[in-house]
Design a protein with these regions (language model features):
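Serine endopeptidase catalytic core focused on the charge-relay Asp
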Residues: 23-24, 28-36, 43, 51-158, ...
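Residues that form or immediately flank small-molecule/cofactor binding pockets and catalytic motifs
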Residues: 153, 164, 188
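Catalytic nucleophile loop of clan PA
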Residues: 40, 162-185
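Protease-domain processing segments flanking chymotrypsin-fold serine proteases, especially trypsin-like
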Residues: 1-43
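Charged/polar, solvent-exposed surface patches and flexible loops
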Residues: 17-21, 150, 199, 205
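C-terminal cap/linker of serine protease catalytic domains
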Residues: 180-207
Length: 207
């Protein structure tokens, strides 16, 4: 069977209609006023988070007490207090950083949600159509359409979809329902959806 037979038909137009409201879920991340990467806002169990790559924000920013700012599409600079360590989660092995957002009133935008099929086997996502919202060349937000063509036993996604270095930390979204299935990390993606209990790889949320 040809690969194309696996790709689900989708109404691209309906997806484009909601892109405008989703744009504010993507942010540039600045550390000490220097742009270093991309992140996105997501909602898990009614809690709001900033998710990005471990290669963009890691433990050293806590130790060095650096100032982290977010720049969203309406050009509003939002400061986030990251001094509460219990609300920051790192996973170096899978390259993920998650920061719980307390000041929800400061960020009035669209929070992305995790895909509904979090308990299905990883093979479920093979050949699924995806798109990636990203800041290309550190300028405007672009959307790239593609598909997943491989998932290895480390939950690394190999996809056919245009990205560059500035895409690291961007969300990988299921084209069918516009929900998160992964995050861009270097030259590959990380699948956030597991068949185990937690949708986040190796990360437990603290109540």
């Amino acid at each position: 069977m040809d690969r194309k037979d696996y790709i689900e038909p989708i109404n691209i137009l309906s997806t484009k209609k909601i892109l405008e409201q989703m744009i504010n879920s993507i942010c540039k991340i600045e550390v000490n006023n220097e742009k270093i990467g991309t992140g996105y806002f997501c909602k898990v169990n009614s809690m709001n988070f900033l998710m990005t790559s471990y290669y963009i924000i890691d433990e050293k920013y806590l130790k060095e007490n650096k100032e982290i700012n977010l720049l969203i599409n309406n050009n509003k600079n939002i400061k986030i207090d990251i001094e509460i360590q219990r609300e920051i989660y790192f996973n170096k092995e899978y390259g993920i950083t998650i920061i719980e957002l307390k000041d929800e009133d400061k960020i009035k935008n669209y929070y992305l949600e995790l895909d509904d099929n979090i308990y299905k086997d990883n093979e479920y996502y093979k050949y699924k159509s995806i798109y990636i919202l990203q800041y290309l060349n550190d300028k405007e937000i672009y959307v790239s359409y593609g598909y997943i063509n491989e998932i290895n036993n480390k939950n690394e996604i190999k996809y056919i979809c245009y990205t560059d270095n500035s895409s690291i930390g961007s969300p990988i979204l299921n084209l069918k329902n516009n929900k998160i299935i992964g995050i861009v990390n270097n030259n590959y993606g990380i699948l956030l959806i597991l068949s185990s209990v937690s949708p986040f790889i190796g990360i437990s949320f603290i109540a």
